[in-house]
Amino acid sequence: MGRSRHHNKLKEGIFEAEITALSHDGRGIAKVDGKTTFIPFTLPGEVVKFEYTFTKAKFDEAKVVEYVKKSSNRVNPPCDHFQICRGCSLQHMSTDAQIEHKQQTLINQLKYIGNGVEPENILPPLRTSNTEGYRNKARLGVRYVSKKGKILVGFRERNGRFLADIDKCIVLNPLVGDKITEISSFIETLSIYQHIAQLEIAIDDTRPAMIVRHLEPFTNEDLEKLRSFAQENNYWIYLQSKGPDTIFRLYPQGDVEPKKLSYQPAAGIDIGFEPNDFTQVNNDINKKMIKRAIELLDISENDSIIDLFCGLGNFTLPISQHAKTVIGVEGEPTMVKRAKETADNNNITNVNFYAANLFESFEDKEWFNNFEYNKMLLDPPRAGAQEVCNNIEKFNVKRIVYVSCDTAALARDAGILVNTKGYKLISAGVMDMFPHTMHVESIAVFEKI
């Protein structure tokens, strides 16, 4: 005999609650009869009237009917698409309040995930003067929607199922963000407009590059249209038919100068990169972040420093201007190759780069056994640097500067360093790499006791 399924019935009517916190994706959280209710576009301290839109055993979802009490931190969102587009989550919150919330998130996670870790000092937040047009990297979805009779280009809707119908994006660099409609209209002129899946955007100090991910071959006429569009808009256009190894530059063709996109992380250093390489999203904050990391490392001319998860040498190369020697280690061999090329091109001779998986044992590696370091910079991906922290005593470094794109991973690793490895957390703070979003970029300094 089949088992009947139990369906939770949606409560009907208008209800009232106070918002007490924000979720990881920026929705307001209210407790109603002890049950968590997520209510979008609300802020802590606000009282709202709402109606339920979805219910499950452990939580409910709802939408605002009326704001009974508004937060003093509430502002009018600067983007017309904020209600539908998932690209931003905090445009209704003042930038000061966004920073304060991110700083508190960092402190809370250090304490609870890090098992009681607290920084001796809170660093002043690194802020950008421009909270719009800051984003130089993005992946934009492309979809032909027959009901609308047009191509959509942009981020997903808040429900995550479809692309948001937008005509511009205020957080993207305006060289692309102001041209969403123009790009959409151009794609409609291509013969395979229904088979273009994604545009990967990367913008250097002077020009945008765009990788067009296509599922069917372009015709010769399409290719000519793409070249013309690139020339008219000063874009570099790349095509990608399958995996990353199929990416090639369509325009400009031939042996042109410069051969790659490039940016300056610090005065006197140019880093070349391909549009699918990892680079920081926000150039302004990146430069400030590098400057702060160098200050926090407290570098002397006799220091030997190891930079783990070094990427293209974003920190390694600027650090080399102040230290005796610097070793950069990165898991992706192509990034290591480019970092070496950059060092050569910039006539930097006191650095070396190695490829190694830093999520597994590294005790047999040349860079681990043949060099001695007294300071370390960590800039891991979201997964953090657990393997490194578990073996930190083998490096014998006195000071660690940890740059994090995930506060939970930082808190976990801080717990290892402070509670089991004899380090103290000198200072920590946030960097507003992604204004108007819940993403928290942070930096912390550990010192051997």
UniProtKB/Swiss-Prot annotation:
This is 23S rRNA (uracil(1939)-C(5))-methyltransferase RlmD. PROSITE patterns: SAM_MT_RNA_M5U (PS51687), TRAM (PS50926), TRMA_2 (PS01231). Catalyzes the formation of 5-methyl-uridine at position 1939 (m5U1939) in 23S rRNA. Pfam families: TRAM, tRNA_U5-meth_tr. One of its GO terms (molecular function) is iron ion binding. The gene is rlmD. PANTHER family: 23S RRNA (URACIL(1939)-C(5))-METHYLTRANSFERASE RLMD, RNA M5U METHYLTRANSFERASE. [4Fe-4S] cluster binds at residues 79, 85, 88, 169. Belongs to the class I-like SAM-binding methyltransferase superfamily. RNA M5U methyltransferase family. RlmD subfamily. It catalyses: uridine(1939) in 23S rRNA + S-adenosyl-L-methionine = 5-methyluridine(1939) in 23S rRNA + S-adenosyl-L-homocysteine + H(+). Gene3D superfamilies: 2.40.50.1070, Nucleic acid-binding proteins, Vaccinia Virus protein VP39. Residues 1-66 form the TRAM domain.
